[in-house]
Amino acid sequence: DGRCIVWAPNQGADFVAELAAKISGVPVTAVEVRTPYLGGGFGRRFYTHHYLAQAVELARKHAGRTVKVLWSREEDMQHDHYRPMTMARYRAALGADGLPVALHITNVGDGPDRHSFPESIPKSNLDESVIEGAQKQPYAIPHRRVDYVYEPSRAPLGYWRSVGHSVNAFFKESFLDEMAHAAGRDPVEYRIALLKSEPRFRNVLETAAKQAGWRGKKWKAADGKDHAMGVALHLSFGSIVAEVAEVSAGAGGKPVVHKVWCAVDCGFAVNPLLVSMQVESAIAYGLSAALHEEVIIEDGRTSSSNFSDYPVLSAAEMPDVDVAIVNSGEPMGGIGEVATPPIAPAVCNAMFALTGDRIRSLPIKTAAT
């Protein structure tokens, strides 16, 4: 009858309608998208709708009949659009007080913007999704430079919860911690010294440190093991988040995360319970990726196929999370993704305080990788 009806979880009904219209041959105004509240998205259902394309193509060939397409977990994991692999080099010049006077960042990689919206890439070849979170941060560093080197990915790329912020917070906050230790200064105090003209950021950081009862040195805990804390601060999607993680060393030197304290300023929390739930979820998501998640590609194909060879964070590994909401009254920012970026650097910085070994890649395989 000249219509196309699509039932599918998605993160952009307009994108689904445009795709369905293109494949089915009906006008986009004749496409109806019905979105069930089913499962999560986290970027997977934003623009990578090849499973929908299959369903619409089959429906076109069998007009008048309802077609259902269901992928197995193995099919889904092996035909995903993946989080981009990214590398970075950070260099800094420190002044007599140990604070940075110049910072040079070089990011190397490919990004989801180029794969999903190639028309958005300017003639300069800059993919903003690769460097977001590397610039526009609050620290008072007089001279900064951010370079981007495009290294094309042969694997299909997609959006991942917090997108470029997820990697750039790890790079940036790990390096801030490294500079603090090189200067012989406490990591929290060092950041505060760089935030003298940023009271909103400073308040969030101080709130998280106070929550945690910040300790800059490792200590012997009640379980008889050495424990240590690490901190990270990051701005993303209009919201400021500071996180402190408490860790000890487990089997093989991998971190055991006992507790996370998080302070978040998203402007004003209309629904504080929902904000806390999103923060806890985002921390679990980021921690799972930091500790475990790795897609293995062998002989040109994805070999990871199920949770047996793609482990995720277990309930037993999930730390207690203490959330403090800072209502600054500033314009409201996002909340669904903003607590993901700081968790990996907070944990890795804590491991440095514990072991003296700097973790430089994710996921964490040993105490120093």
Model-assigned labels for residue ranges:
Residues 1-369:
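Cofactor-binding beta-sheet edge motifs in enzyme active sites
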